[in-house]
Swiss-Prot record:
It comes from the Eukaryota. One of its GO terms (molecular function) is antiporter activity. The chain crosses the membrane at residues 39-59, 77-97, 124-144, 159-179, 188-208, 218-238, 268-288, 297-317, 337-357, 381-401, 416-436, 439-459. Keywords: Membrane, Transmembrane, Transmembrane helix, Transport. It is found in: Membrane. Disulfide bonds: none annotated. The gene is DTX13. One of its GO terms (cellular component) is membrane. GO terms for biological process: xenobiotic detoxification by transmembrane export across the plasma membrane. It is a multi-pass membrane protein. This is Protein DETOXIFICATION 13. InterPro entries: MATE_euk (IPR045069), MATE_fam (IPR002528). The keyword Transmembrane helix applies. It comes from Arabidopsis thaliana (Mouse-ear cress). Its main location: membrane.
Amino acid sequence: MGDAESTSKTSLLLPVERVENVTWRDLRDGLFTAELKRLICFAAPMAAVVIAQFMLQIISMVMVGHLGNLSLASASLASSFCNVTGFSFIVGLSCALDTLSGQAYGAKLYRKVGVQTYTAMFCLALVCLPLTLIWLNMETLLVFLGQDPSIAHEAGRYAACLIPGLFAYAVLQPLTRYFQNQSMITPLLITSCFVFCLHVPLCWLLVYKSGLGNLGGALALSFSNCLYTIILGSLMCFSSACSETRAPLSMEIFDGIGEFFRYALPSAAMICLEWWSYELIILLSGLLPNPQLETSVLSVCLQTTATVYSIHLAIAAAASTRISNELGAGNSRAANIVVYAAMSLAVVEILILSTSLLVGRNVFGHVFSSDKETIDYVAKMAPLVSISLILDGLQGVLSGIARGCGWQHIGAYINLGAFYLWGIPIAASLAFWIHLKGVGLWIGIQAGAVLQTLLLTLVTGCTNWESQADKARNRMALAYGT
């Protein structure tokens, strides 16, 4: 083990310097401005990275959709099923690295960052095995759940072609966190843009020219995930910028499995409980009168908020990385300033986006549909969607702060209560008993988001940052010896 790492381990035993809480003078001085600039420089390119990754699936869906209603319906159903049962779970589990790797990097335990990344790859690959069995039996499951047999059959074939992409995704997510937690966003930006630019013509060729049809969209997505993983993996292994955090493959990766899952499982619960609640709202919309209209409009609203959420995620990633780094280094005041800066940036961003949506609400629906009834309904929903953007922006950054601090278990309990004990019951009551239909469903789920945001704000506002820095340093010392 290198001298640098040994020195870092020893430093973890030193007492943390006690500092007073952040004051208005700190916010007026250059500390706040400097941190705000850091967050912007991190979040701006990270937003492009997240959007490029998000658009891979959208491009496949759009091209498959032009093949006909059956292809679109089956691909949409398969994508939704795979997101709920697979991709969301992988993303959630990988968020454990926001705490572990971020704080290790801040504590200058650079080699541990690489070891933790390998541990996460191994664990996520294992998780993919049972998920693969579920996907291979998707047709049977969908028919059992009452789906049309022809749609279920095509959806099952589509999901089977996504399996290679699932395993690639299980490696890609830890790699993304590896670079993100070191604030190395440029490799992510260049790689994501390159893969996206290649994905578009590749998807077109496989869908329209190869005879594969809708399966071509799934195969193109799997190939792009694999290519993305290969490029980032090569950079990790061979780039000089990664020399400090690069670690050789060894039995050491198995030592951290318990610690990884200790944070990964509540991380997955935190992410999936929120993600699944919105999918449940779409399912409930199918039980309403005129289900085609209600489902279409709610899908447009959900697609809009999901796209904009890419920007929220970028700010959340910046906040999570900066806070975990500063806590790992024992800098409690700096971590506190990050919170103020990140929330300030989020407020500016959500005001711009929500105002833009309100101003353009009458043309908003034309982006997604040419049906007048759908366009008018979307315009009616626009004010509610604007409120959703505000809530998503605030809770997204607060969730990033929670991951940076290692509060995933708290976030999981909050999301469980806010959405499943509060939001969804209200949504069902408003939609089916008060007869507000799709509007009621959306109001209900946003009631859950309001409670989620308030509780996360309360937890963050009551935080003793000196104690959090102590916990981070003690966690590093306990996990990696002294």
